[in-house]
Amino acid sequence: MRKAYTLYLLMALLAAVVMACVRKPKPTTTPWGTEVADVDDNSSERVTDHGSSDGITSLQQIMSNGEMIVLTISGPDTYYDYHGRGMGVQYLMCELFARRMGVTLRVEQCKDTTEMISKLNKGYGDIIAVQLEKRKYGDKKLRFCGAYEKKNGSNGIATQWAVNEKNKELASELDKWFKPTFPKLTLDYEDRLLAMAVTHSANWQPSGKAFAASRAEYDLLFQRYAPLAGLPWQLISAQCAQESGYDAGARSWAGACGLMQLMPSTAARFGLSREEIFNPEKNIEVACRLMGSLMREFSDVPHPEERISFALAAYNAGSGHVRDAMALAGKYGGNPHFWSSVEEYILRLGEPQYYQDEVVRHGFMRGRETYGYVRAIRRRY
C-alpha cells in the first residue's frame, strides 16, 4: 500500500509539468511543477551562507539558506541544458528531492569526478548527483546515499550518489526519499518531454490559406523590426514559422513564449516584462534585437550568409554550444567559419568522445534539433 501511494505521489508531481503551447502566460515551472523565478546570466554567482567551519553544509543550513548545490558532470544521464532548462535523469531526480525539501537547486558543473569530489570535500557543494562506483571511490571521504543503481545483476557494479562523509542527516534524508522505481519513472518522463519537443518541431510545417493568413498578419511587423537584426524580413518570418507556427499565444513546456518563443529571462535582458512577452509586436522586436546581437557576436565568421546560420543555431541552442562545435571543427580539420563543417559537430556533441573533448566548455548537447532548426529555416527562406 505504501509503495502504491509513493508511486501515486511521484506521478502526481510528474503530471504537474507545464505542457506545450498554452495560450496565456503562466508562472515558469521546472519539469517537476515547481514554480521558479527566471534568473539572469549571473545567477550562478549568487552568494549564500553556505558551509560551516569544517567545510560541510548541514541539512539544517541547507534548509535555512533555501538552496541546495548539486555537483555534476555533463552527459545525457547526468545533466545538460535544454532550451534553458536542466535535464538528465540524475538531475531531474535531484530536482525532485530539492522540491520535497522545499529548497531551490543550484547546479555546479564539473569537468570530471576528481573535481566533483574535491569541491564536495571543500564545502562547495552538497550532493554529487552522479552514479559513483562504490568500489572505486569508497576511500574518498564520501557517504554514499540516495539514488543508486546496480549494473549486471546482484553481482554487478554498485553505484550511488554521495555526500560528504560527515553529512549524516542529509544522507539519511536522501535514503528515506529514494525509491528504486524513481530512475525508470524519471527516464520515461524525460523521454516524453523530449518527444513533445520533437513533435512540436516536426509539426511546424503548416501550409494553405489559413497559414498564409496568419503569416500575412505579422508581415508589417517583420518588415518594421528586421532592420534591428540586419536581416531580411522574410528570414525573420521563416524563423517565426519554425518557432511557433505564427501562434502569438504559444508557450512551450520549457517556458518559451510567444511568436518567437522568447524565454522570459532573455526577454528581461532586453527590457521586456512578463506581462508584455506575448504582445506580438514587442515579441518580434526583442527577437530581432537578439538576432542582431547574435550576428554581431559571430562577427568572426567573415561571410554574412554563413553568419546567419551560426546566429540561428545560437538562438536555438545558445552561443556556448555553437562555439564548442566551432572549436571541434577547427581541431579535427574542418573550417570553423563554414556552417557545413560546424553542423557536423553540432550533431557529434551528443557523443562522449566529443562532448568530453578538452576544447568543449559547455558539455553534452542534443544537437539534432538545432541541426534541423537551421536547415528548416534556411529552406523556408
Task: Kindly give the residue locations of the regions a language model identified.
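A ligand-binding cleft/hinge motif common to bilobed small-molecule-binding domains
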Residues: 114, 118-121, 128-143, 323-324, ...
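Export/targeting segments at the very N-terminus of extracytoplasmic proteins
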Residues: 197-246, 281-284, 299-302
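Catalytic and substrate-binding regions of cell-wall glycan-acting enzymes that process beta-1,4-linked
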Residues: 163, 306-380
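Ligand-binding clefts/hinges and TM-proximal coupling segments of bilobed small-molecule sensing domains
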Residues: 44-46, 176-213, 381
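A bilobed periplasmic-binding-protein/Venus flytrap-type ligand-binding module shared by bacterial periplasmic
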Residues: 155-171
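Bacterial signal peptide processing site
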Residues: 22-25
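Substrate-binding/active-site groove segments that recognize
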Residues: 249-275, 282-293, 377
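Extracytoplasmic small-molecule ligand-binding "clamshell" domains
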Residues: 27-131, 174
